[in-house]
Amino acid sequence: MWWGGRGQSFNIAPQKEEPEMGSVQENRMPEPRSRQPSSCLASRCLPGEQILAWAPGVRKGLEPELSGTLICTNFRVTFQPCGWQWNQDTPLNSEYDFALVNIGRLEAVSGLSRVQLLRPGSLHKFIPEEILIHGRDFRLLRVGFEAGGLEPQAFQVTMAIVQARAQSNQAQQYSGITLSKAGQGSGSRKPPIPLMETAEDWETERKKQAARGWRVSTVNERFDVATSLPRYFWVPNRILDSEVRRAFGHFHQGRGPRLSWHHPGGSDLLRCGGFYTASDPNKEDIRAVELMLQAGHSDVVLVDTMDELPSLADVQLAHLRLRALCLPDSSVAEDKWLSALEGTRWLDYVRACLRKASDISVLVTSRVRSVILQERGDRDLNGLLSSLVQLLSAPEARTLFGFQSLVQREWVAAGHPFLTRLGGTGASEEAPVFLLFLDCVWQLLQQFPADFEFSEFFLLALHDSVRVPDTLTFLRNTPWERGKQSGQLNSYTQVYTPGYSQPPAGNSFNLQLSVWDWDLRYSNAQILQFQNPGYDPEHCPDSWLPRPQPSFMVPGPPSSVWLFSRGALTPLNQLCPWRDSPSLLAVSSRWLPRPAISSESLADQEWGLPSHWGACPLPPGLLLPGYLGPQIRLWRRCYLRGRPEVQMGLSAPTISGLQDELSHLQELLRKWTPRISPEDHSKKRDPHTILNPTEIAGILKGRAEGDLG
């Protein structure tokens, strides 16, 4: 490492091997006492967190500049403004904190035009005067150094960030870091949301949904059926576990059909992987498969989940384009920005997901039937559509508790590969499907603000939590991996270890925590902002509660099977794809669906249902969102958070936000007082009195005339 004047170069040594946590600091020569981290800085670290380097006297941003200290630890990069009061209750959610895994790009800047990427092993031609930290959550941290970057500590903190970021893809390095309040109290901590890790959790949820024709299966308790499935799931009462084991072997990755949600009117929403067509099932296996798919209903609708929805590669490409467009340093001209936004295809994919979820919601709520979501892997789009269908159909899922339970059941417990899809194992299979789902939920929140108990701030907190590696919720791909890491399973075999519910000893306490432990990362005042002040429980009808089969549920002919694809229902001669299989379900040629156009939803064309089902009214409690043109909007508070000038003027979603915005406007009005006419000055108004709309309009008009003059 050497230093010189402007124009000289420095080299960032490549990482030769993955060191243990904190070894970056331990392997260096001890710094002089004056350069050791102060006790004040060290006291602000989380248990297990170590300061690698820091640089005081840096400045953040351009206008207005904010001076402070840039700190790099083995967990995050944080900027601490001068005089900033650190809050022990909120150690991880500062707007100045960037988890290492959240850093998407690190750039060095010198002058006005010299910009280079910083990565291990790269040779740079100049000393950085500034560094740009691009967050994968659409945030940007711009930090300038004193003396044009010639201070040794500026170079040290830059080196530390580059090296620490290179090591951040190793999830095990966070195993010794715990949240500051995680160890408070004695005994095990009760999860705020059922984690769906025990048979009791599944039985409680089954009773809550009144799914009387279903039971909790323990066939996968040792994860010997499928490691990506939860230990427990719901299967029909009359199916034995031995039949479940054989039937699941004929589906991709062993993910056979199981209940996702039971509608109060009687319909069942199932999900499964693709048929394993290379298998050779016998007659008993085919019978078990069809009984599980039929779920005791005379009408069965098989939904091709991947039809008309983007592929994983499409989702990843659209997200990369969106992130590049929304960053402050985007080179797209303002007059072409909307066209560039349309070119990302992100909003098109949001529109496609909402449209298909609306169609499936109509299928589930309009008749008593079995609706099966089928995706080859059953771990991505099935979870997205199943969750959206429940949000559209069940008011309970729109509550704060219900939504968190929904995500835990349909995403976390169901085996969505969070670590892979969020880029934790490399970019080859990265695809932020869960973030696409959160955008869809935000669209629903904008269109139906009185129907959701949670606010936009809650969605933002959940969106940002996927980039904070403080719990195992988003650090593992399957329930088996989470159980193995937390000591519930043997590390090398899929053998069940009794007593897994007991919290592990030592520093691994946080392994039992989940993303839903908001009180460990947020203050009570911040958690209050998760509530939507416009939520009206009375707005949600009570007719969705369990009751006998309603009049709008009209059963069809016996044993009818349909394929829902491209907005139309097509009859199937048999349910299983195996050649010459003695299918128990066959459709009669006289029950043919009416022609449907793929570009229109079922709700827009009387649902496109077969004529024998008759005309049915929309069931109460069902939300049918709009998805045409301007009805689908950009989530500006999330994607444009790196542009403060765009954030100004956004509507405040909470009462406290409205109060802050009102205080800001009153402060502006007090500053504009000299522009008010003499007649207004003679009134001797109290500066804290709220002006009425007429007076505000007069002030703004006077300001505008003064600016024009």
Curated annotation (Swiss-Prot):
Expressed in bone marrow, spleen and thymus. Pfam families: 3-PAP (PF12578), Myotub-related (PF06602). One of its GO terms (biological process) is phosphatidylinositol dephosphorylation. GO terms for cellular component: cytoplasm; extracellular exosome; membrane. It comes from the Eukaryota. Residues 196-639 form the Myotubularin phosphatase domain. Residues 1-39 are annotated as: Disordered. PROSITE patterns: PPASE_MYOTUBULARIN. One of its GO terms (molecular function) is phosphatidylinositol-3-phosphate phosphatase activity. Belongs to the protein-tyrosine phosphatase family. Non-receptor class myotubularin subfamily. This is Myotubularin-related protein 11.
